[in-house]
């Protein structure tokens, strides 16, 4: 039997029997006598112990709030058993909740013990750090990176004015490469995102809307974070190079990148034009040109005449000539192929022709004596044409053009062209007086009528003393080429 004591009296109220609606049955009986204070009151500690053993927490709070037991009226005394039952049921429910909470705390404590003692704990933490705590790791390392970048920027700002032209061009080429890499990173990220959206849509079609989100959200966030880190690193390098070049910082969007590229291209074009005007830089090889530069042709021609017996260079000679002339190896080889056909072969043919003609003249001296009347006839025709200043009568198969240029009173020069239709030959006779005097005499006329090949020409020179010197076409061609 459970007993309740009332302050100031020793009446004992019997508790009613257990009702089936209640969840617990209390059959304990308390026979312990409680010590009283000097005011004949029950000590509060004993009362709290009894009520706590019965689960009467709410009544214990009411006792503490009220401070003492108070007398009730008769109607309250009649209702006391019903209230006592209701209080008992609430106390039983609170005890159940406390028991459940205690069990839950015991289970959680058991789980924590097993997790801390597990051998998979470290591996799971590393996986979570890779997938979830990437931003935290970046934030931890970000201040050091910012400090390093600040130091680099200060050093570059101090050395901006001291950058030579070669390093500036190298930095510009590196900047263009980084910009192309940045575009490639953006393009690959767009491609990855598009493929991920295709996978998500296929999951949604089969399993329903939003079915792929638990599987693809984490992967998409991780890959996008990696792409973002890579893009930030490349952008940082681009900004550092721009600051080192002394240019203004452009925005990180596409417009800023396009404007910076246009600026770099414009700057390079202006520098190349300025160098070409000064003559420091040769024009690009891919531009159409009429032949090779004169300096390069002089070097190649000198090598050709030095190695006249073997006019085509070896591979090592080609590399050496390409370095000396500033041309490519293919251009050097093409020039020697053309020169061997156009210059070297005709010169060799003329040399052999001269040798054969000299041998014939030595073997046939009568032929040289027969040629002397022809020379005298040509000289007479020239004197007559100078007096008549017109065509020579009696010569039907020849056309003659005469041009006389006078310089001063004591010297003159006469040029006469004659082309014979029968033999197809051409003779040029120069009459010079007072050859001891020095000075240049202008000469004109007759050159535009030379339409025959140079291999069939014979040049005869007559001075005032009527000495004849025959000049072969090979010697003239050699002088022209050299």
UniProtKB/Swiss-Prot annotation:
Domain notes: The SR/KY and BELL domains are responsive for the interaction between the TALE/BELL proteins and the TALE/KNOX proteins.
A Pfam family: POX
PROSITE patterns linked to this entry: HOMEOBOX_1 (PS00027), HOMEOBOX_2 (PS50071)
Region span, Disordered: 358-401
An example Gene Ontology CC term for this record: nucleus
Biased composition range(s): Polar residues: 363-401
Residue span of region BELL domain: 167-238
Name listed for the protein in its UniProt record: BEL1-like homeodomain protein 7
Subunit organization: May form heterodimeric complexes with TALE/KNOX proteins.
This protein's UniProt keywords: DNA-binding, Homeobox, Nucleus, Transcription, Transcription regulation
Region (SR/KY domain): 118-134
Family of this protein: Belongs to the TALE/BELL homeobox family.
DNA-binding region: 285-347
Chief localisation class: nucleus
Subcellular location as annotated: Nucleus
